Amino acid sequence: MTKRRVGIVFGGKSGEHEVSLKSARAVMNALDPEKYTVIPIGITRNGQWLSGGDPLLALEQQADQKMLGRTPQAGVVSETAIVQSAGSLPEQTNVAALDVIIPVLHGPFGEDGTIQGVFEFANLPYVGCGVLAASVGMDKGLMKSAFAAAGLPQVPWQLVLRRDWQTQPEAVYERLEATLHYPMFVKPANLGSSVGISKVSNRAELATGMAEAAGYDRRIVVEQGINAREIEVAILGNDDPKPSVPGEVLPANDFYDYADKYLEGQTQFAIPAELDAATSEQLREMAVTAFKAIDGAGLARVDFFVERETGAIYINEINTFPGFTAMSQYPKLWEATGLGYSELLDRLIDLAIERYHERGR
């Protein structure tokens, strides 16, 4: 059997750089060496593309690029590195020879349609959502608008531009307090993994949370906090997506933050979640609706709130390339549904190639 050549792209310029490295390590360890030849391709924080040697180890150790045994071209960016591969990547990693790419990238420049557009331009099969779905799924404001159009219920929320907050902070605070009540969650519109998110209970905390979020993005989403269970559903597929069993996040702190997700926090998970059959099925159906609402492909994780007092379900967000570490919910949800980690990767690669041929029709 001819092995498929799989390019694993990781790192990147976003605030989720370290998360990407953890996910990439797990993916590379899980790919069956009898089926695949793995070609690691790293992206530094300043956008340089690295290959040859061990770029993942180099980025993990924050080592000098000389560790790779070569000096990458200064300022190499997406289009140059991918399309003109001979000029920026060693011959043995010519991306034109790859059968498929897994962009194990989270956040801006990786999960937001940017790199997906590069792969489309270069006519390369890749795992995951296309340009449109990735873009909408990354921006919480656009995502929420798509969910509203699909009829999915959400908690009240407001979008704030960083410039408005910087020039008229008191007016912004008054608008938020008039439309929402404390506690609120303040989030950068274009980051995931709970990076830059704050739970705020008064105006002083709101000001601090706005400053934190504004450090990451020019668009800030502020949501109404509710007393709710956090439920997640994994999605797998293209035009006929399938949902996993629901799982519940049991955070040790006020909310499921970055430290709990990736730094061996105290958060626990219940998979499958303890839900009645009707609620479980409704969550799974809503997850599929959300995936289709953004024209998703390959994979996603859809997060929900289930209000404790009423049982009402609200969609929170969709993650178009969720974390893939050993601690991550997405592979755990599929394992509980009957699909192991390595088999999940096999299926994602098949879906990427199927979608590539579908686009070529």
UniProtKB/Swiss-Prot annotation:
Source species: Herpetosiphon aurantiacus (strain ATCC 23779 / DSM 785 / 114-95)
Function: Cell wall formation.
Gene3D superfamilies in UniProt: 3.40.50.20, ATP-grasp fold, A domain, ATP-grasp fold, B domain
Pathway the protein acts in: Cell wall biogenesis; peptidoglycan biosynthesis
Superkingdom of origin: Bacteria
Binding site for ATP: 177-232
Protein name per Swiss-Prot or TrEMBL: D-alanine--D-alanine ligase
Reaction catalysis annotation: 2 D-alanine + ATP = D-alanyl-D-alanine + ADP + phosphate + H(+)
UniProt cofactor note: Binds 2 magnesium or manganese ions per subunit.
Entry EC number(s): 6.3.2.4
Organismal lineage: Bacteria, Bacillati, Chloroflexota, Chloroflexia, Herpetosiphonales
Keyword set, alphabetical order: ATP-binding, Cell shape, Cell wall biogenesis/degradation, Cytoplasm, Ligase, Magnesium, Manganese, Metal-binding, Nucleotide-binding, Peptidoglycan synthesis
A molecular-function term among this protein's GO annotations: D-alanine-D-alanine ligase activity
